């Protein structure tokens, strides 16, 4: 069973870029593994580092700014997670420490993969995201409160409403991935299998 997501308060980092694709999130040369851990070190590798080995941080990239170290909420622009389909993208984001991504829109496959990996993608309007970017840039180090149960983001003096499909919301709040959902019906599955005839080779 995955970790339950009900509420989260976290430091916000503003990634002021639209159409951030999955190859930027986790470049293809780091996709050899099939486990979910270890990808955070290579998140935004080509932007975070000046060298191919990832040993020389790029001081001009926002994730490397001192005031955003430990950020767990990523604020981005439209069409986040576009490009090729790779579940490694939410793996890298969660392994780095992100719990929430806020943007006006997401690529469909990335959006679905995020829920499967307990990464909450929050859609707000362009105008609301503009407000949040202005707020974060004026207040480096600000924290947002994200309440999945109430479907609200509290930022500064304002509250922003978002909507999540009821089934996905239920799964995240109860820490249920596809395996967890299946295990909820373990008794019924076992009963069905017990009633099936056994075949001999």
Curated annotation (Swiss-Prot):
What is this enzyme's catalytic activity, as reactions? Answer: (2R,3S)-3-isopropylmalate = (2S)-2-isopropylmalate
May I have one GO cellular component term? 3-isopropylmalate dehydratase complex
Query: Example GO biological process term?
Result: L-leucine biosynthetic process
Enzyme Commission numbers on file: 4.2.1.33
Q: Which UniProt key words apply to this protein?
A: Amino-acid biosynthesis, Branched-chain amino acid biosynthesis, Leucine biosynthesis, Lyase
Q: Which InterPro entries does the record associate with it?
A: 3-IsopropMal_deHydase_ssu (IPR004431), Aconitase/3IPM_dehydase_swvl (IPR015928), AconitaseA/IPMdHydase_ssu_swvl (IPR000573), IPMI_Swivel (IPR033940), LeuD (IPR050075)
Amino-acid biosynthesis is among the record's keywords: yes
Q: In which pathway does it act?
A: Amino-acid biosynthesis; L-leucine biosynthesis; L-leucine from 3-methyl-2-oxobutanoate: step 2/4
Family, per entry: Belongs to the LeuD family. LeuD type 1 subfamily.
Its assembly, as annotated, is: Heterodimer of LeuC and LeuD.
Name listed for the protein in its UniProt record: 3-isopropylmalate dehydratase small subunit
Q: Which gene encodes it?
A: leuD
